[in-house]
Amino acid sequence: MLSQTQEKLIKSLQSNKGRAKANLWLVEGPKFLELAGPAVQLSFTATDTANFRQLITTDSPPTIAGTARPPHFQLADIIAKKTILLLDNIQDPGNLGTIIRLAGAFDAGLILLNCVDPGNPKVIRSSAGMIFQAPWLEMDLPTVQDWLKTVDLPVYRLENTKLATPLTIDSNKAWPAKILFVIGSEGQGITAPVNGQSLFIQHQPLIDSINVATAVAIALFIRYQSA
């Protein structure tokens, strides 16, 4: 059975402040706990507490939940990937989680710049547990800019501007072995002052833009054909 102290701690993990204080995340579901692996600190089911539904964040409760330490990836883990995603100000947890899931599917690394807390339970769920597998790091803008000065990475900005080149299935033929995609939010676009070649995804004009995670999926699929 969970103690009152344990329940209080688990409940606190639903907030950014609580996660930061405890250095723990709330992980909901057996598959995600499996992917968290040795990072898991505690697991519990409805038989361990009468307050199970209050301790989790999903409307449809999983059979098991738990707490886990955030993964600790190194910059070398990200640089080792042929494709790196620089995510700029992605604030929707569902979008961030989906992009992390895509990074796992298409073997990419991620740098998070001013994004929503990756420990948000919705990020973890939307990532399908890939938050514990696909390498990522949070960086501030000065650190990103300093890092870019030390690496020779062609930069491609996913954005619809007048000077942007259409992204097509043949784009991968011109891409070198290692590249960096810069991706901004659907509402604000790319706000980080990171120079690069602009690429846009063609679509029907009756909509202004496509969902950012959808755009990343298209770009990564094309990239994966040559990476």
Give the location of each predicted region.
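Boundary-proximal intrinsically disordered activation/regulatory segments immediately upstream
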Residues: M1-T45, C115-G119
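Short active-site oxyanion
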Residues: A20-L24, V40-L42, A108-L110, Q133-A134, ...
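Amphipathic alpha-helical repeat scaffolds
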Residues: G29, Q91-T98, I210-A215
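Generic beta-sheet signal
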Residues: A46-T49, T67, L113, M139, ...
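Glycine/small-residue-rich loop that forms an oxyanion/phosphate-binding "nest" at active or ligand-binding sites
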Residues: T49-F73
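Structured adenosyl-cofactor binding patch, chiefly the S-adenosyl-L-methionine
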Residues: G66, L102-A105, N120-F132, T191-A227
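RNA substrate-binding interface of SAM-dependent RNA methyltransferases
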Residues: I78-K162
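Active-site/ligand-binding-proximal alpha/beta "capping" segment
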Residues: R157-D208
